[in-house]
A protein has these predicted regions:
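Conserved, structured core segments of small domains
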Residues: 1-99
Length: 99
């Protein structure tokens, strides 16, 4: 079983659906939800070798961490996210490699 990180994208952090929808989805994930994560504030900074720039083009709006047997399973679980009903909402799924 591996760990997978969900990075959420919506218009703004407040566009991500209501707490009841998120609670229902998290409840459905059961013990596979390792860390419900947090929403991000609107904006962020990208640090480059040459400096720092504000993230303006579709910044991430939050994260969660789940466990799954495969990328396919983690991706299938993400399809139930409340952001799927939000215009331009998206969930990016990344596998966290063991160190």
């Amino acid at each position: 079983m591996g760990k997978y990180v969900y990075i959420y994208y919506a218009g703004t952090a407040s566009d991500g659906g209501n707490a009841e929808e998120w609670g229902k989805w998290f409840g459905g994930l059961g013990s596979k939800l390792v860390d419900g994560g947090n929403p991000f504030n609107d904006g962020g900074q990208a640090v480059y070798q040459g400096g720092v720039m504000p993230i303006q083009d579709k910044p991430a709006t939050g994260y969660s961490i789940v466990t799954a047997d495969s990328m396919e399973e983690a991706t299938e679980m993400a399809k139930g996210c409340p952001l799927m009903s939000v215009k331009d909402g998206a969930v990016c799924v990344y596998e966290a490699l063991p160190m």
